[in-house]
Amino acid sequence: MIENLIERLPKLEPIKKNIELAIEEIIKCYEKGGKVLIAGNGGSACDSEHIAGELLKSFLKKRPIKEDLRKELLKIEDGEYIADNLEAPLKAVALTSHIGLSSAYLNDREPYLIFAQQLLGFGDKGDIFIAISTSGNAKNILYAVKLAKAMGIKIISFTNENGGKLSEIADIQIKAPAKETHIAQEYHEAIYHELCIKVEEHFFKEDR
């Protein structure tokens, strides 16, 4: 499934099966009407936004909106323009985005539970939580994954080669073959790009 990625980055061979399993689980989640939630800190927060961006709009494939929605839009002024330019999303929520909620909760309650609070608000049983922490020990991520377990949300972890506590909790562990944070993050980007490509290819067939 991901031979091209492994050919470019052969050090990923030991985690090939886990990457493919993550792709399969995300596809199953979307087929059942679920969504993907993503969180991380610092550079991993940027990765969270990046993943959501690739899923919510066209990446490499054309994504026409559903025909029934298009028909409804064509009944209204500017409907054709809207229908022709919107792209069908794969539902994703970056839990790093909601500054009003985040700042209010951080000010009023427990700072380390900020991602857990958002997961509680946005998540549903059967969703997937992509938890990114290069060390695998970020407290706010660990609290969120514990909540995810209780809610019936499957967890895919992105960490460095050690994995930390996060890899002990996650359902699918993606451990980048590096100890250094910046190198692990470089692997993470290549992996989640491939993940987004393969998920998109499953649902949309026509190249842009």
Task: State where each predicted segment sits.
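Short, glycine/polar-rich helix-capping loops at beta-to-alpha or helix-loop-helix junctions
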Residues: 157-169
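Glycine-rich, small/polar surface segments that engage phosphate groups of diverse ligands
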Residues: 28-122
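A charged, well-structured terminal subsegment
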Residues: 121, 182-208
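Short, structured coil segments at secondary-structure junctions
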Residues: 88, 168-171
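Generic N-terminal amphipathic, Lys/Arg-enriched alpha-helix
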Residues: 1-14
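Short glycine/serine/threonine-rich phosphate/pyrophosphate-binding segments
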Residues: 45-49, 112, 137-144, 166
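Short, well-ordered beta-strand core segments
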Residues: 129, 155, 172-174
